[in-house]
Regions:
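Accessory cap/linker subdomain of secreted extracellular hydrolases
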Residues: 26, 38, 88, 95-99, ...
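C-terminal, loop-rich substrate-recognition/catalytic regions characterized by aromatic stacking residues
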Residues: 24-26, 255-259, 354-649
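Short beta-strand/loop motif that positions the catalytic acidic residue
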Residues: 307-309
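Glycine-rich nucleophile elbow surrounding the catalytic serine of serine-hydrolase chemistry
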Residues: 178-188
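Cap/lid segment of the alpha/beta-hydrolase catalytic domain
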Residues: 71-166, 214-215, 350-360, 490, ...
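N-terminal cap/lid segment of alpha/beta-hydrolase-fold proteins
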Residues: 35-73, 497-503, 570
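Alpha/beta-hydrolase fold nucleophile elbow
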Residues: 168-180
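Active-site-adjacent alpha-helix of alpha/beta-hydrolase-fold enzymes
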Residues: 105, 318-336
């Protein structure tokens, strides 16, 4: 053993050297910081007061909450939005001392909020932005998919409880409103709601991620949303960004191969939610137990609820109608209301006078906010409750561009005795004809070749990146209203068109695709589009001459023909029946127009490509699995239209 001094000498030497250095370094006076510990800015010119608080939940997690109170407010109702999209940004759309100015933007019907004198509250959900806790996409209710004692229902309850006890300017009445994911959260609030929750407005809500909202449609994966998944789930503050080096998104997705391979290339396997998507391609218990329409069908209807549906919603076109159908039969006291508007996703809070090339003759969104949303909120959130009651259903009728006030949905007219809805077959007949009514032609078929190496694009190329910034050429929200004439001439699209209409054809409700089709492969996708073909010349708006406007369209993945939870190979070259619903429509095909149906087997890159050979999980399809297939659409196929007819005397 070495002497102890030998072992400590290096340490002592180092310490002494440091001491000597400190002794030789000149000591300067400190330079005070020019940043105050807390900045108290001038607020005399502001017509609102903003407070930021961390509200504790029952498990101790604190959620970042921003409260904006009109200056001088007393006995004001509270309008709450819970969001994963950054609460701070939603009350900071502009740098201004004016309340309406800072609220004008996403998730805020600013005119209604300000005119109503409401206290605006925005909260980050757990795990996002300023809130504590762990983020789980569409966190399920406590149960088999969520063993914890907390979910969005309990978090909303705890938040409302805190708000009514800690905001002295309020009258203790709370409403909850939101769009998309933020529209899903009001639905969760309806499960065991807080007594102070007096009204809910779910707008374009996420409801069933497999059947027809964000993640799948009838089993076909919406790979266009992969950028959203990455940006939303891999960081707390959405700091990771999806990138592309391609001018055309079509090329980016083609070069990657399968959606699973693209996910691997982008590192999505690090995300728990992505791994759930990949592990649950069928409609199994994972999806069924989260479907909000199924959940709410088992709940009593106690809170007045206004569901808002956009007829050209590119993201959540299934949800609002599905919830309405689920809960309306249990509505004994007239608490369930519905709006259908001619908008894109979230379009009810924007300018609603136009949609792409379409002109509606008035600002439809402004009408809805002032004539429907404003009195609806006032009736339940104000102390006097003197606002007029709204109609059970307020539906915009496209084609005629008229608002209709109805007693229920679907309903052909305000007086349900004056008309009736009758299912009428639009036959896909020989000679590329669409024939309304009459007997089916059981002979023959139309044929096309579907090539996964050249899938049908979902819109005209080049396809801009998914996004909402029109200044950057991102027109994703309005693609459903794109002109479809480019696709009616393709050899891999079967097109059927009616004769010119001599009388109007009005439809209200859900068209049903009823295909008899075969494929030379062992799996196939079927896309059906119902289209209004404008006359070749439209004097009032020349740009609409010959326009082919999608009224309703969707996709069905053939492997689920015998059961949505049981994928099976298709029998090759055998005519098989496929029946699936298309999104709700409320439209009049006018005289001089024609009705068209397009059928195809890809819709790319909106949906991932079907390899057309059966594989256990398409996410993991290999390059050799993708093969051409010959598709036949038999003339016994039809689209069942919900036609409004005058009732028999």
């Amino acid at each position: 053993m070495k002497p102890i001094f030998a072992r400590i000498t290096p340490a002592l030497a180092f310490a002494l050297a440091g001491f000597a250095h400190a002794q030789s370094t000149p000591q300067y006076p400190g330079l005070p910081s020019e940043t105050p510990a807390e900045y108290l800015g001038p607020t005399a010119d502001f017509n609102y007061v903003k407070r930021t608080v961390m509200i504790p939940m029952r498990d101790g997690t604190r959620l970042n909450t921003i409260i904006v109170i009109p200056k001088g407010a007393k006995h004001a109702g509270i309008l709450l939005t819970r969001t994963p999209y950054d609460a701070s940004s939603q009350v900071s759309h502009a740098d201004s001392s004016d309340l309406e100015t800072i609220l004008t933007g996403y998730d805020n019907a600013a005119d209604v909020i300000v005119e109503g004198g409401y206290i605006r509250v925005i909260q980050d959900v757990r795990g996002k932005y300023g809130s504590e806790g762990d983020y789980v996409m569409n966190r399920p209710l406590h149960g088999p998919l969520n063993p914890t004692p907390v979910d969005h229902s309990t978090d909303t309850y705890d938040t409302i409880d805190w708000l009514v006890k800690n905001i002295p300017e309020s009258n203790g009445r709370v409403g909850i409103i939101g769009i998309s994911y933020d529209g899903f959260l009001p639905l969760m609030a309806l499960v065991n709601p807080h007594p102070a929750l007096k009204v809910a407005v779910p707008m374009n809500p996420m409801v069933d991620g497999w059947k027809g909202d964000d993640w799948f449609h009838n089993g076909a994966f919406r790979q266009i949303n992969m950028s959203y998944v990455l940006e939303q789930v891999v960081t707390r503050g959405n700091t990771a960004k999806w990138y592309t080096t391609n001018f055309d998104d079509y090329d980016m997705y083609m070069r990657a191969g399968s959606a699973g391979e693209l996910g691997r290339q982008r590192g999505l396997e690090q995300s728990g939610f992505w791994n759930k998507l990949v592990a649950h391609p069928a409609y199994d218990a994972f999806w069924q137990q989260q479907a909000m329409d199924k959940i709410l069908a088992r709940q009593p209807v106690t809170v007045p609820t206004l569901l808002v549906h956009s007829l050209w919603d590119a993201e959540d076109i299934y949800g609002a109608i599905a919830v309405y159908k689920a809960i309306k039969p249990h509505d004994k006291d007239g608490k369930v209301f519905l709006t259908l508007g001619p908008w894109v996703h979230g379009g009810a809070i924007e300018n609603g006078a136009t949609l792409g090339a379409l002109r509606f003759g008035s600002d439809t969104a402004l009408y809805w906010r002032q004539e429907v949303l404003k009195p609806f909120l006032a009736r339940y959130l104000k102390d006097d409750a003197s606002a007029p009651a709204i109609a059970p259903v307020t539906a915009f009728e496209t084609g005629t561009n008229q608002w209709r006030k109805l007693s229920s949905w679907p309903s052909g007219c305000a007086d349900t005795k004056a008309c009736a809805i009758k299912p009428v077959a639009l036959h896909l007949a020989a000679g590329d004809k669409a024939v309304l009514g009459g007997a089916a032609d059981d002979k023959g078929y139309e044929e096309y070749v579907s090539d996964p190496a050249k899938p049908v694009p979902f819109r005209q190329r080049p396809i801009p990146p998914y996004g909402y910034d029109e200044a950057k050429g991102q027109t994703w929200p309005r693609w459903l209203a794109d002109d479809q004439r480019e696709f009616s001439g393709r050899t891999d699209v079967a097109t059927f068109v009616s004769d010119v209409l001599s009388a109007p054809v009005k439809i209200s409700g859900e068209p049903i695709a009823s295909l008899v089709a075969s494929t030379s492969g062992t799996d196939s996708d079927w896309v059906v589009k119902l289209i209004d073909v404008y006359p070749d010349q439209v004097a009032s708006q020349p740009a609409m001459g010959g326009y082919q406007l999608m009224i309703s369209a969707d996709i069905f993945r053939g492997r689920y023909r015998e059961g949505l939870d049981k994928p099976k190979p298709l029998a090759a070259n055998k005519p098989l029946n496929y029946r699936f619903g298309l999104p709700t429509a409320n439209h009049v095909f006018l005289p001089g127009h024609r009705i068209m149906v397009q059928v195809q087997s890809s819709w790319f890159p909106l949906y991932d490509r079907n390899p057309q050979t059966f594989v256990p999980n398409i996410f993991f399809a290999k390059p050799g699995d993708y093969r051409k297939a010959t598709q036949r659409i038999y003339h016994s196929s039809f689209v069942e239209l919900p036609v409004v007819e005058a009732a028999a005397p």
